[in-house]
Regions:
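N-terminal secretory signal peptides that target proteins for export/translocation
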Residues: 1-2
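Sec-dependent N-terminal signal peptides
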Residues: 5-14
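Membrane/wall-proximal cationic-aromatic binding patches
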Residues: 23
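Active-site neighborhood of divalent metal-dependent phosphoester/pyrophosphate hydrolases
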Residues: 27-51, 56-116
Length: 116
């Protein structure tokens, strides 16, 4: 009996979800683009500069609103504060394309905690 009840509940859940799906896609006419990347802070090593240039070139086409840097934004010993010189050498001098002069939102990973 439990299996039958579970099956009916599952069927009703799927049916309700399938019926409630979006059908008017015009709300997606306005595009919203952004970058999500991680392991960016390599102080110029590991092809960081060519990748940054490619991000800028792609940005000319897609027009990203912001960059979400998801962890490990400062290898190898983290940063001490928002005024740490690594922000300049890891980001400002590397990601210098005009299309990358947008908001950056770094998410701290395990490498950031070493310096602070």
């Amino acid at each position: 009996m439990k299996i039958k009840s579970l099956f009916i509940l599952l069927f009703l859940s799927v049916f309700t979800f399938a019926h409630a799906q979006l059908t008017d896609y015009s709300i997606f006419d306005k595009k919203f683009n952004f970058y999500v990347a991680n392991d960016l802070g390599r102080n110029g090593y590991y092809d960081q500069k060519p990748i940054a240039e490619l991000m800028g070139t792609m940005g000319e086409e897609i027009g990203p609103e912001f960059v979400l840097a998801t962890g490990d934004v400062h290898h190898f010993d983290g940063v001490r504060s928002v005024n740490d010189p690594l922000w300049m050498t890891n980001y400002e001098l590397i990601y210098s394309h005009p299309e990358l002069m947008i908001d950056w939102f770094p998410v701290l990973g395990n490498h950031e905690y070493r310096g602070n």
